[in-house]
Amino acid sequence: MRIVVDTNIVFSAILNSQSLIGQILLYSDKTIKFYSPRFLQTEIQNHISKIKKLTNLNDSEIYELIDLLYDKINFISEELIPKETLSIADELTKGVDFDDVMFIALALHLKCKLWTGDKLLMKSLQQKGFKRFVTTKELKEIQKK
C-alpha cells in the first residue's frame, strides 16, 4: 500500500516519536510505503525552532530523529508531477492551504491515499469530491496484519 504523508504527520512524529503516529512511521514494514514531495523537508526545516521549543531533545537528537523518519519516506521531486495534476490539486486546495497542493498532487499522481491530520483540509477536499484519505487508526490495523 502506498501512502502520501502530509507534513503535520511527520511533525507529530518528531514531537512524540512514541505516539501511535511515530510508531507507525518509524516501525512500518514493507506493507506500507510512504511517499512525500520534497517540500515536506522544507516545511520541517522552516519549523525547526518550533520543534526545538516543543521537545526536550537537543539538536543532535532532533536531527537524528528527523533522519530516521526521512529514511522511511520516499521523497519525490515536485518536477515529476504532471502540470495537469498540479492544476487539479491547485483547484482542490483553493481556499484552504496552498502548502498542501503538492501533497494532494502527489496523491493524485501516485493514485494513492493521503495521511493527514488536517481536519479542515480533509473536510474541504471531501466537499470537492476528493476522498483518498487514510486514518492513523486504519494504518494501525494494516500494520497489525
Predicted regions and their residues:
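Short gly/ser/thr-rich secondary-structure transition/capping motifs
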Residues: 16-17, 57-59, 97
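Short amphipathic alpha-helical segments and helix-helix/interface helices
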Residues: 22-25, 63-66, 103-104, 122
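Active-site neighborhoods of divalent-metal-dependent phosphate/nucleic-acid chemistry enzymes
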Residues: 75-119
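Acidic, PIN/NYN-like endoribonuclease modules and their adjacent C-terminal/linker elements
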Residues: 36-37, 108-109, 113, 117-145
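Residue-level signal for well-ordered alpha-helical positions
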Residues: 17, 47, 127-128
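Alpha-helix capping/helix-boundary segments
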Residues: 9-10, 40, 103, 120-121
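PIN-domain endoribonuclease scaffold, especially VapC-family toxins
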Residues: 28-30, 35-87
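Short, well-structured N-terminal submotif of metal-dependent ribonuclease cores
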Residues: 1-36
